[in-house]
A protein has these predicted regions:
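A structural signal for multi-pass alpha-helical bundles of membrane permease subunits
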Residues: 3-296
Length: 296
């Protein structure tokens, strides 16, 4: 190894050490715990080794409900938030006056506390003895009887959770896509206009390919973020998410460790490995798809 390579590895050593201590080692540790049946963290003992923890988790109705909720959240919020962010970014890029003001307004939810936003959404959607909530008041204007979005039907609660998640992640995506659109050279657009190219074709043949790396980045991070959702559900429905049928996979893992059903690190580890495998699989699929559709 020459001096240049040795110096490079020396610079990388702090980052490698950090990743090894705080990411690789815990992941390996959790993987080992997931096979240890009846693991006791206090005495560091277990009763056996096998696949019992995985069988238990995959048959647990609470886990299956959390898995269903998480997949619905991912499937709805990632494409909706990315598509809305792209439309808004295109609109912001096409105006000159008040652009900075609109960018600031759209970015405000990103710097607002998550729980504070959750309280606002509860005021908007929750029915109480004193009020039906602002959204239901508006529905009454159109002759609708209204819906209890917080304590009512499952799909009403899922709608609020998806709406809330999109609201939270939208500002960051707008910021990224607005910057990506601003980085596209005007020479491409000028040449296309000289040739009389329609606007929709300019968008599909120039704009989308040029910003496709940023769109791919937002899709990947969106998938990972949606699979890690937990605080969003707590902000809206409280800590007893199993009773509300609105738990997520991360919430299930937390409950197995610290919740009312807590004290089962082996089950929590098995659920965490399942979540890791799902996220890793989807990420690999996205990487394979990006080779054909992302232009670097």
């Amino acid at each position: 190894m020459d001096k240049r390579n040795a110096k490079g590895w020396l610079y990388l050593l702090p980052a490698i050490a950090f990743l090894g201590v705080f990411m690789v080692y815990p992941l390996v540790d959790v993987f080992v715990y997931s096979f240890e049946e009846g693991y006791n963290s206090a005495s560091q003992t277990f009763s056996g080794v096998g696949l019992f923890n995985y069988r238990y988790v995959l048959r647990d109705p609470y886990f299956l409900q959390a898995l269903k909720n998480t997949f619905i959240l991912v499937i709805i919020t990632v494409p909706v938030s990315t598509g809305l962010a792209l439309l808004i970014s295109l609109g912001l890029s096409s105006i000159e006056k008040l652009r900075s003001l609109f960018q600031t307004v759209y970015f405000l939810p990103y710097v607002t506390n998550t729980l504070a936003v959750g309280l606002v959404f509860m005021i908007l959607f929750k029915k109480t003895a004193y009020t039906d909530g602002l959204v239901n008041v508006m529905l009454h204007w159109f002759g609708s009887p209204g819906v209890d979005f917080i304590d009512g039907p499952y799909w009403a609660k899922m709608f609020v959770l998806c709406f809330y998640t999109v609201w939270i992640v939208l500002p960051f995506k707008i910021l990224i896509l607005t910057s990506a659109l601003a980085s596209v050279k005007q020479d491409y657009y000028n040449a296309a206009r000289v040739d009389g190219t329609p606007r929709w074709r300019i968008f599909t043949r120039i704009t989308l390919p040029m910003i496709s790396p940023m769109i791919f980045y937002l899709v990947i991070t969106g998938f990972i973020g949606a699979f890690k959702a937990y605080s969003d559900a707590v902000a809206l429905f409280g800590t007893d998410l199993n009773a509300a049928q609105m738990n997520t996979m991360v919430g299930y893992i937390y409950d197995m460790l610290y919740g009312d059903s807590g004290g089962y690190p082996s089950f929590a580890s098995a659920a965490a490995i399942i979540l890791f495998a799902i996220v890793l699989t989807i990420t690999c699929i996205n990487l394979l798809v990006s080779r054909k559709h992302v232009h670097y």
